[in-house]
């Protein structure tokens, strides 16, 4: 579910890799939730 995706993204970001990718992912999720995309 969504929570496991967020947890996976947090784990990915905590490695210090793909921070830009993580930010894009978070932006995309926020966009879908607010239906602004």
Curated annotation (Swiss-Prot):
Source taxon at top rank: Eukaryota
GO CC annotation terms, alphabetical: extracellular region
Disulfide bond recorded as keyword: yes
Disulfide bonds: 31-37
GO BP, sorted A to Z: defense response to fungus; defense response to Gram-negative bacterium; killing of cells of another organism
Subcellular location: Secreted
Tissue-by-tissue expression: Expressed by the skin glands.
InterPro entries: Antimicrobial_frog_2
Residues of the signal peptide: none
Keyword annotations: Amphibian defense peptide, Antibiotic, Antimicrobial, Disulfide bond, Fungicide, Secreted
Keyword Electron transport in record: no
Cited Pfam families: Antimicrobial_2
Family of this protein: Belongs to the frog skin active peptide (FSAP) family. Esculentin subfamily.
Function: Antibacterial activity against Gram-positive bacterium S.aureus and Gram-negative bacterium E.coli. Has activity against C.albicans.
Annotated protein name in UniProt: Esculentin-2B
